[in-house]
């Protein structure tokens, strides 16, 4: 088919561009799902197939469907070379362990600002003064914004780890959480802090699936957010940035490059910038989009966007400004 002829060279190129431990996610409707799976088996190899994730794309499916009302899209996942890297899904609330240990030597440890989460119901935005409420002492005043300190800080207590060991753990992806005012800090090792993702990206309340696992939005959520950002309804059915962030968090490291062959409204770019702002990452994005003309009757054309590329470029500019503010 024309669709297969269009996809084949792009997927072939995508495989060649992936690093050895790279991953590809491909969003597809049910109509071409079978064909896409066969195509990817040929290009990436059946052994490198990971999963077909199901995503609830709409909460308002067409009411006039005669057989069924389709709510789902699918995301096909392959690795270039299947490996042992674990994917991070839902964060485990109970996956943390105490860093304090009675009887250990009292020592000072320096923590990076973006590696310690202060539970926001206990630590609202503002200044946390130097204090020793119990067994842990905060050496200096710090400012907390949205659950994170705005600068590195030092804690003093009977800690299990030395500074060198702490630094090694941080390099492996270990993070920390402080849940109460007594500052009893706990650590979350990267491999222990997450469930593996299920193949349902957004659970809905049905007899089969009755637990919502994450905060991934729908097309309607994405349209509302984009309309607010662009001050007009200029792009139909954009993907939610929460979907891209959820997938990226499976495996993407803070210095990785993310390529989108069909960038459309540049959701990938927006999601990557937002991720970087949240964890001080240095991820980069490459967006590829043909300059497909907008219809002269469309809101996009009336707003001055003559092709889809112009929409994406303006979204990147506006999203970048919003993320920095």
Predicted regions, residues:
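Class I S-adenosyl-L-methionine
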Residues: 1-257, 279, 290-295
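Conserved S-adenosyl-L-methionine
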Residues: 4, 33, 241-322
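Phosphate/diphosphate-binding loops
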Residues: 75, 79-82, 314-324
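Hydrophobic transmembrane signal anchors and adjacent membrane-proximal interface regions, especially
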Residues: 136, 185, 271-273, 325
């Amino acid at each position: 088919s024309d669709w297969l002829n269009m996809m084949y060279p792009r997927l072939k190129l995508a495989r060649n561009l992936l690093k050895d431990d790279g991953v590809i996610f491909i969003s597809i409707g049910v109509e071409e799902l079978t064909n896409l799976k066969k195509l990817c088996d040929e290009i990436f190899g059946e052994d490198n197939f990971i999963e077909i994730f199901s995503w609830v794309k709409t909460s308002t499916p067409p009411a006039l469907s005669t057989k069924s009302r389709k709510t789902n899209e699918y995301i096909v996942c392959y690795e270039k070379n299947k490996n042992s890297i674990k994917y991070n899904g839902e964060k485990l609330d109970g996956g943390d362990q105490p860093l304090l240990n009675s009887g250990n030597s009292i020592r000072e440890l320096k923590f990076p600002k973006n590696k310690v989460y202060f539970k926001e119901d206990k630590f609202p935005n503002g200044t946390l003064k130097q204090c020793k409420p119990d067994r842990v002492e905060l050496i200096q005043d710090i400012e907390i914004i949205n659950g994170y300190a705005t600068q590195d800080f030092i804690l003093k207590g009977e800690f299990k780890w030395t500074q060198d060991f702490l630094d090694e753990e941080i390099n492996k992806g270990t993070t920390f959480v402080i849940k109460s005012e007594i500052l009893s800090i706990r650590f979350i090792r990267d491999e222990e802090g997450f469930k593996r993702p299920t193949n349902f990206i957004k659970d809905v309340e049905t007899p089969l699936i009755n637990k919502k696992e994450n905060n991934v939005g729908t097309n309607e959520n994405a349209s509302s957010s984009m309309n607010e950002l662009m001050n007009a309804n200029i792009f139909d059915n954009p993907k939610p940035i929460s979907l891209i962030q959820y997938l990226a968090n499976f495996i993407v490291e803070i210095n990785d490059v993310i390529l989108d062959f069909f960038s459309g409204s540049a959701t990938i770019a927006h999601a990557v910038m937002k991720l970087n702002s949240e964890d001080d990452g240095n991820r980069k994005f490459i967006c590829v989009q043909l300059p497909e003309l907008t219809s002269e009757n469309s809101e996009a054309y009336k707003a001055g966007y003559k092709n889809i590329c112009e929409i994406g470029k303006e979204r990147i500019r506006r999203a970048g400004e919003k993320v920095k503010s």
